[in-house]
Amino acid sequence: IDWKTCSWGWDSRRKADSMTTYQLVLYKHFFAIKHNIDPKNIVTHFALLKRTAKKNRVEIFKVTSGAKKTENCLKLLNKAIYNIKKKRHIKNRLACTQGFGCEFFNTQFCSR
């Protein structure tokens, strides 16, 4: 179980978001390797601790992580590691604002 705090909970889109669920997929994968456990015997869940909800302040939902999802997740992780090692960084141009965004805005390190 991975415990998360939130205000009202997550909508179905957030619960199904691959980048959110890949976190638990990786936990399961590496836990299974470390402890020599068959991944089929491990079940993963998110537990949402809702700060402002009046009722049902804790919501627990299962995150599925079969072989194909694990393969896709590891492929994405390996691509990210490769690009980081090759110094291929993606520029977030939406963060190029003075004051609230990139700390390198209009400095010698800015390639905007």
Where are these regions (language model features)?
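Non-catalytic protein-protein interaction segments used by genome-maintenance enzymes to assemble
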Residues: 1-24
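Metal-dependent nuclease catalytic regions and adjoining charged, substrate-binding loops involved
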Residues: 29-112
